From Swiss-Prot:
Enzyme class per UniProt: translocase
UniProt organism field: Leishmania enriettii
Ranges of the Cytoplasmic topological domain: 1-72, 346-712
CDD domains for this protein: ABC_6TM_Pgp_ABCB1_D1_like, ABC_6TM_Pgp_ABCB1_D2_like, ABC_MTABC3_MDL1_MDL2
InterPro entries: AAA+_ATPase (IPR003593), ABC1_TM_dom (IPR011527), ABC1_TM_sf (IPR036640), ABC_transporter-like_ATP-bd (IPR003439), ABC_transporter-like_CS (IPR017871), P-loop_NTPase (IPR027417), Type_1_exporter (IPR039421)
Lineage: Eukaryota, Discoba, Euglenozoa, Kinetoplastea, Metakinetoplastina
Protein name as it appears in the record: Multidrug resistance protein 1
Amino acid sequence: MSRAHAAYANEGWSAPEGGIAGKDGSTRDCSGYGSQGPLFSAEEEVKGTVVRETVGPIEIFRYADATDRVLMIAGTAFAVACGAGMPVFSFIFGRIAMDLMSGVGSAEEKAAKTSLIMVYVGIAMLIACAGHVMCWTVAACRQVARIRLLFFRAVLRQDIGWHDEHSPGALTARMTGDTRVIQNGINDKLSQGIMNGSMGVIGYIAGFVFSWELTLMMIGMMPFIIVMAAIIGSIVSKITESSRKYFAKAGSLATEVMENIRTVQAFGREDYELERFTKAVLYAQGRGIRKELASNLSAAVIMALMYVSYTVAFFFGSYLVEWGRRDMADIISTFLAVLMGSFGLGFVAPSRTAFTESRAAAYEIFKAIDRVPPVDIDAGGVPVPGFKESIEFRNVRFAYPTRPGMILFRDLSLKIKCGQKVAFSGASGCGKSSVIGLIQRFYDPIGGAVLVDGVRMRELCLREWRDQIGIVSQEPNLFAGTMMENVRMGKPNATDEEVVEACRQANIHDTIMALPDRYDTPVGPVGSLLSGGQKQRIAIARALVKRPPILLLDEATSALDRKSEMEVQAALDQLIQRGGTTVVVIAHRLATIRDMDRIYYVKHDGAEGSRITESGTFDELLELDGEFAAVAKMQGVLAGDAKSGASVRDAKKASGHLGVILDEADLAQLDEDVPRTARQNVPIDELAKWEVKHAKVGFLRLMRMNKDKAWAVALGILSSVVIGSARPASSIVMGHMLRVLGEYSATKDVEALRSGTNLYAPLFIVFAVANFSGWILHGFYGYAGEHLTTKIRVLLFRQIMRQDINFFDIPGRDAGTLAGMLSGDCEAVHQLWGPSIGLKVQTMCIIASGLVVGFIYQWKLALVALACMPLMIGCSLTRRLMINGYTKSREGDTDDTIVTEALSNVRTVTSLNMKEDCVEAFQAALREEAPRSVRKGIIAGGIYGITQFIFYGVYALCFWYGSKLIDKGEAEFKDVMIASMSILFGAQNAGEAGAFATKLADAEASAKRVFSVIDRVPDVDIEQAGNKDLGEGCDIEYRNVQFIYSARPKQVVLASVNMRFGDATSNGLIGQTGCGKSTVIQMLARFYERRSGLISVNGRDLSSLDIAEWRRNISIVLQEPNLFSGTVRENIRYAREGATDEEVEEAARLAHIHHEIIKWTDGYDTEVGYKGRALSGGQKQRIAIARGLLRRPRLLLLDEATSALDSVTEAKVQEGIEAFQAKYKVTTVSIAHRLTTIRHCDQIILLDSGCIIEQGSHEELMALGGEYKTRYDLYMSALS
């Protein structure tokens, strides 16, 4: 059985050897990394691991401030003092044991004094143990928060070229996963290691004081232990970093999928993406298992050598007593001191492993923090008080860093004067947007120079230069927050009045005021709750509120209908005409650049790169009658300024209102007519927390999920039983050995001494073998746990992809938070399985076997100890419950959301100089979390200290009561020693269980967050079987369809819509931005479910159809084309797995992109970059169109599919789409703001405020003389 089986156990999936099978029975090969190319480089595959450095043991604390250093110093002092407790105890124990064996005086009187000293030691341990946990936990929280902040700041500081090579998903995985590893290595786990290490050192020092000869003999094995620890530590470090790197790739993949979830679902690629993700996490799983086995091998060797040393110690100790060199008290004190010291050193291993892992995890993070980018926003430079003269490109040679062999500009020279209005025109992919990028200094040219006011841009203060620039990009990026907050990002200190005025100019004010919450309306993650046009107008308002000296407009109005475009263009013209504003425009609609002072026509000549072939005013270029004039004629744009104020006034008159707002009575009536579920009644802002609260997580559930690895858990439990039972059992041998030594002190019987030593000392070899075997088997916990982690990660990822789009609109369910779940939370759940079972079983065995031994040898003493156990266990449980109370507050992960959103929109963050704003928001989220972390550390430390005090108190009580029994003749010294030591081990392990409470509490909170998603059944469920008989053709009808977004429950987006899309017909949807056009398309893709009414396909209710089958018959091209990291070929083939190269190329020809692709150096194997960053907007859109056409669907949905294209290219693409439709008899539904695009549709539907106001063919609507005719005439007047 392959490892992939584990990922689907008990969840309705099977994974036969060599592949992953979905519910449909189809099997996919898992030998590679899907079709997206190899997961790792050939060099990495050959090596079998990723060799990586670690930071130094001191360097990892480089970001500690004075407070942290004081806390760490104090915590270290407390830890050392805590470690001294057991050696001090060994001295007291040896003295009182000698006194009791001597038979002189009252045993009870002597024990009372010793017990009182033990209580004093317990008080000291309370302070010391609480202190070291508190100090190190708080210091770690503070440092990791600072590291996260610095890493985030450093990542945002990096140049765009660096970001082109580092996906946001991988960076987010480092932020969430690796920083947790760092914290786990430098928190109280490290102080536990210091405590255990000091116990070892002080124990050995005490041993040398009591008997240097015996101590030397006992520590003879130490060189072997040290060498073994060093070797294993190095191996674990390399394996850990390898695992981290592999999962960083998996995290990047997952983030990209979640950000492009509409594309994934529309093309039914959930199984494919699950396969890719599974492949990636299986790599990480393999390394994780190796790490667990290596760590347990280290522990096995160390513990075995320790027990071997006990055999040697008792043999040699007996001779020292016989020779009169030492008495029994010295031997007992030495043995216990070195014994506890050895145990202390043995317990250093987990802390050492965690510390090593943290140093490995810190390496890449610190490397990023230290990196000084070549284009550095934080660097100084020549001040830029304003823009006065010009921007000059002087012999610029440029290639993108990700494609250094593909020269874009070989010798670009041009000058943009201050106050000048300049436009760039040309076919898609010719380099227009690259000019915009160079002006913002996203990149530096590889030759020549860009000068500002005669100064090289490299020498300017970059931050001040970007402050001079306002930009609206082709694909506007918004941020989670309100309308007001997003507009104000353009000018953080803008007043409300300035924001409102900017929104008026951008023609979005009336839309905002029609919403229930107005300017406080949330836009959703990356603006997901807004239409494309609304997002673009918000982005325009964001640029306008800044009133910048330089305004860059990269297809700023491409997503707007003609009315909105004219209104916004008028506002932009007013801004331009105020004077002093330098404007650089990229626009494919030549009518919008008619008034430019200068227009540059750019042409791309394949391998020769791009160059300016024509330049001049609009009229001059028409007179030139070159390539620009040919495009202008194609668009119907004539010389002269035909745009009039009347046109703009007509546009304003034609504007409709947006939205139908429901009052409480309407909502109540709607809920009565169409009942809502309990989940749907929860406010969307509270929904994530509500789902976490109702999540059910239990140990039995985890056991069922991992039942195929029950054998490994059984071996692990066997190891816990062996290890747990060995400790109390060894106390029997020790007790008998001490009796032999004590009797010799009284009788001087050498023969009895020899025979007793020969009988009992070799028994420690048995314990050595048992412990070695036990710790080796203990590694199977890690084996099972790693498999469980992989299963949960795969299951969570699968369930995330299963959710409907409504899920991703919920606050706290964005890609960043979900990526954090896949990384950190799933890893934390591991603790509930392997380590949790091991600790519980081991603790139970130690306590149970200790009590059994105690009852056998002295039942009265065992009863006293048993009566004290609830106190210790209760204290540990209290600590765990209190910590758990603070971990619940982690739900939400605001910091993860901020990180993912900022990194996904890094170009916008860079353009708007928002780095410090994002850092401040992230810092505020960290600051909000800090008090909870500190309180958790203080509580954890306090209760841990109390636990240790109770341990010493219980032992003092047992010791005093045992002496009382000796005085009464009811017990022998041997019985008291055996019972006391066996109970001591049980009590000590109970304390260790308490120390583990923090991690378990965190793991439980993580598990609830994870299972709140795993258990969620979406309203539109792809796994719900439906009718697979779709009928013939594709005839669609909407009957009284009403739709409301859950994020805006009072706003009706579609109000009782009735329409029909006939089979094999072409249908166009037009209307003002935000009127519901995209909603119609997204409902057809089953992204959202209607609120009421009926949508039918060939007479069948769409909601009754099998979703997977339905989506196999549709294809969609969204307004913002979502591409994936990989090659051009892979992205086109994404729509239809198994398509031949010929079919891919044919689809590319229809989308008019084939001839461009074959001119690229790597052709169809050209990497497109994260989200297609390596391509222009038009190139991305055409590849997305090719992908859609390759599917050969019954229904083709086009949402502004050609908005980023120039008119020449658009016309050719439109020809390809029409030819495709005619050939395959496809039903098409198109949204377009360019009315010429849909003029030839069989049916055109005009929507306004969620209602249909007109519908019919172009000729019918023109004859009607209504709203459509007004809009069409307005559109054509702008082109004439």
